[in-house]
Design a protein with these regions (language model features):
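N-acyltransferase acceptor-side catalytic subdomain
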Residues: 1-232
Length: 232
């Protein structure tokens, strides 16, 4: 059994999360700005589908990417070297999250519900959520979004409309975060795609120890601007 959270209830300790399904911790509450920030500070994220209650997760192990461990495959390096694109930050957050919410091939629905879109748009408006966007020929070709607290970044979702567009965005994000001394990127669940970039699983206890330090750095709420020389 998992607890059902009322509006003012705090999250239970992440150690109480279920083993199956891995990481399910609680249900209920809301997607208010304060609740989402509290969740991320606590190593918890929302994940649910249309028609389900609001579910909160903290899996063990946790997939993370340390910026200094970024791996870029040779083919992507060549693609980046062509410089026939522009990577921007925070110019089209709502377009990025809306694109991420579109059902993927082979999927019937999406976990990025209308309520989630509105909640993360509010986070972006408050300066805590950011989008990284790949533009080709003046069109948004791919990108990703996530949450930043202190020197911790939480990746949420990505999309692509052109070959390698989301990969280009991710590579630029990680290079920039390393330059800004961010310590860790939360990738939540294991995927082969992120593993190719150097992401790996660590124990939830290790994740939480690192998280506590990283989220306590000063928090900027300014819109991001990426450096122009990340791949010079």
């Amino acid at each position: 059994m998992i607890p059902w959270l009322a509006a003012n209830d705090r999250f239970p300790p992440v150690e109480r999360a279920l083993e199956e399904p891995n990481g399910l911790l609680a249900a209920g509450a809301d997607l208010s700005l304060a609740r989402l920030i509290q969740a991320y500070e606590s190593g918890i994220f929302p994940w649910y589908s249309e028609g389900q209650p609001l579910l909160w997760w903290s899996p063990d192990p946790r997939m993370v990417l340390f910026p200094s461990e970024l791996k870029i495959q040779r083919s992507l390096k060549k693609r980046i070297g062509r410089r026939d694109f522009e990577v921007r930050a925070d110019t089209s957050f709502e377009e990025v999250i809306s694109a991420c919410s579109e059902p993927r091939s082979g999927q019937e629905g999406t976990w990025i519900t209308g309520d989630m879109v509105a909640a993360y748009a509010a986070l972006a408006g408050a300066g805590h959520a950011h989008s990284i966007e790949t533009w080709i020929g003046g069109e948004l070709a791919g990108g990703l979004y996530g949450v930043a607290l202190g020197r911790m970044f939480y990746g949420e979702s990505m999309f692509t409309r052109a070959p390698d567009a989301s990969k280009i965005a991710l590579a630029h994000l990680v290079r920039q975060l390393e330059r800004w001394d961010f310590g860790m990127i939360d990738c939540q669940m294991k995927t082969a795609h992120l593993a190719r970039f150097g992401a790996r699983e660590i124990a939830r206890a290790d994740f939480m120890r690192k998280l506590v330090n990283l989220v306590n750095y000063p928090r900027s709420t300014r819109k991001w601007r990426l450096d122009d020389d990340l791949f010079d």
